UniProtKB/Swiss-Prot annotation:
It catalyses: 5-amino-1-(5-phospho-D-ribosyl)imidazole-4-carboxylate + L-aspartate + ATP = (2S)-2-[5-amino-1-(5-phospho-beta-D-ribosyl)imidazole-4-carboxamido]succinate + ADP + phosphate + 2 H(+). Keywords: ATP-binding, Ligase, Nucleotide-binding, Purine biosynthesis. It comes from the Archaea. Pfam families: SAICAR_synt. One of its GO terms (molecular function) is phosphoribosylaminoimidazolesuccinocarboxamide synthase activity. PANTHER family: MULTIFUNCTIONAL PROTEIN ADE2 (PTHR43599), SI:DKEY-6E2.2 (PTHR43599:SF3). InterPro entries: SAICAR_synt/ADE2_N (IPR028923), SAICAR_synt_PurC (IPR033934), SAICAR_synth (IPR001636), SAICAR_synthetase (IPR050089), SAICAR_synthetase_CS (IPR018236). This is Phosphoribosylaminoimidazole-succinocarboxamide synthase.
Length: 235
C-alpha cells in the first residue's frame, strides 16, 4: 500500500512516513521555463535522489543542518518534516543565466564575494526577485532570518566549491530552499542536484547540468551528463 501523498511538484512527490518524517520521492521528469517545457528522462529520479543524498551527507559532515535522514529506496529519501518557505535562495559565483539578462553583467564575470539573491517561488510570475523588505512584507523571512540564510548558503557554497574543485569541476551557482523544523530552526531542505546548480568542467568548460536541457540538447545528452557527474562525485 502506497503511503499517503501530501504534495506533488514538478520533479518530486512528498508522502507521509511517520509523525516526524516525510518520504521525498524523485520523479523522472525534467522541466524548464517554469514548467512550460517538460519531458520524462528514465533514471533521472534515481540519479537526482542519489546526488542529493550525497550532497546532504557532505553538508551534515560540515556541521550544516539539512532535512536529510536517510534513503528509503534508490529514488526516495526519508526527510525531517519542515514548514517550507516558498523562497529560492540563489548564490552566484560566476555570471550566467538570468542575472546577465536582468543586469549589465557579462557572461562569465566572477563574483568575489558571491552574490546572493532571493526569489519568490511563483511559476505564474516567473519567480520574481525579492529584497529584505519584500521578505518581511510577505511574512516569509525576517531580516535576521534572511541574514542567517545568507550565512548558511555562503558556507554551503564554500564546502561544495571545494568538493567539486577537487574533482575538476567549477560551481557557477546553486539554489537552496529552506524550511523550519518544530523548534523553528532554519534547515536546508528540498534537494541539491543538477536541477538546482550550474556546474562546468574546469578544463573544457563543458556544461554538466540542466542548462543542457534548457539549451535544447537531446535527452540522451542530458542523461549522460547527469550520469557522468554522479560518477565523478561518487569517487
Amino acid at each position: 500500500m502506497e503511503p499517503k501523498r501530501v504534495a506533488e511538484g514538478k520533479t518530486k512527490i512528498v508522502y507521509e512516513f511517520d509523525p516526524e518524517h516525510y518520504l521525498l520521492r524523485f520523479k523522472d521528469s525534467i522541466t524548464a521555463g517554469d514548467g512550460a517545457r517538460k519531458d520524462e528522462l528514465p533514471g533521472k529520479g534515481t540519479l537526482n535522489a542519489q546526488t542529493s543524498a550525497l550532497f546532504f551527507r557532505l553538508l551534515e559532515k560540515n556541521d550544516i543542518r539539512t532535512h536529510y535522514v536517510g534513503m528509503y529506496d534508490e529514488k526516495t529519501m526519508i526527510v525531517t518534516k519542515l514548514k517550507m518557505i516558498p523562497v529560492e535562495v540563489v548564490l552566484r559565483n560566476i555570471a550566467t543565466g538570468s542575472i546577465v539578462k536582468r543586469l549589465p553583467i557579462k557572461e562569465g564575470e566572477v563574483f568575489d564575494p558571491p552574490i546572493v539573491e532571493f526569489f519568490l517561488k511563483d511559476d505564474l510570475r516567473h519567480d520574481p526577485l525579492l529584497n529584505y523588505s519584500h521578505l518581511q512584507y510577505f511574512n516569509l523571512l525576517t531580516r535576521k532570518e534572511a541574514e542567517i540564510v545568507e550565512e548558511v548558503i555562503v558556507k554551503v557554497n564554500a564546502v561544495m566549491k571545494n568538493f567539486l574543485k577537487e574533482r575538476g569541476l567549477v560551481l557557477y551557482d546553486l539554489k537552496l530552499e529552506f524550511g523550519k523544523d518544530k523548534d523553528n530552526n532554519l534547515i536546508v531542505g528540498d534537494e541539491i542536484t543538477l536541477d538546482s546548480m550550474r556546474v562546468r568542467d574546469e578544463k573544457t568548460n563543458k556544461i554538466l547540468d540542466k542548462d543542457l536541457y534548457r539549451k535544447g540538447e537531446s535527452l540522451e545528452v542530458v542523461k549522460k551528463a547527469y550520469e557522468d557527474f554522479f560518477n565523478l562525485i561518487s569517487r
